[in-house]
Amino acid sequence: MKRPARPVLKLSLQFADASHRAQLPRHKVLRWIRAALDVPAEITVRIVGTDEGRALNRDYRQKDYATNVLTFDYEAEPVVVADLILCAPVVEREARDEGRSLEAHYAHLLVHGTLHAQGHDHEIEAEAQAMEARETEVLRALGYADPYA
């Protein structure tokens, strides 16, 4: 039986600090995002430092701190168009504090952001449970542990 074709993904990968490039190889980012996609997408992933992460979170969410991932979704159909902003120092700290590998944490946050870009949310408990279940399903298929366990 033939596997269904994966949705087309156009990816732009940007690093505010080139030192983060080695931690996040393009082929892995492509794999993680594609695994979470249900529709074609044009996604920019930007890895930022604390100052840029904090400024974006403050300006767009009125929260004056750097957060792990921000999703800016611009279009949902027929092609998802979105920016995923990950704050490297926050991601690194969380991975260390939670005893997870940095790779697994980046995979989780990129899957999480990709689901947001497709309309998933976690503001309401039922939606949060559905989104977490989908994240876990995708991450397990990629060979990672349940991030919520």
From Swiss-Prot:
Keyword field: Cytoplasm, Endonuclease, Hydrolase, Metal-binding, Nuclease, Ribosome biogenesis, rRNA processing, Zinc
GO cellular component, one term: cytoplasm
Enzyme class at the top of the EC tree: hydrolase
Highest taxon of source: Bacteria
Gene Ontology terms: biological process: rRNA processing
SUPFAM superfamilies named in the record: Metalloproteases ('zincins'), catalytic domain (SSF55486)
Pfam families reported in the protein's UniProt record: YbeY
Cofactor: how bound: Binds 1 zinc ion.
Family note: Belongs to the endoribonuclease YbeY family.
NCBIfam families (UniProt xref): rRNA maturation RNase YbeY (TIGR00043)
Official protein name in the record: Endoribonuclease YbeY
This protein's encoding gene: ybeY
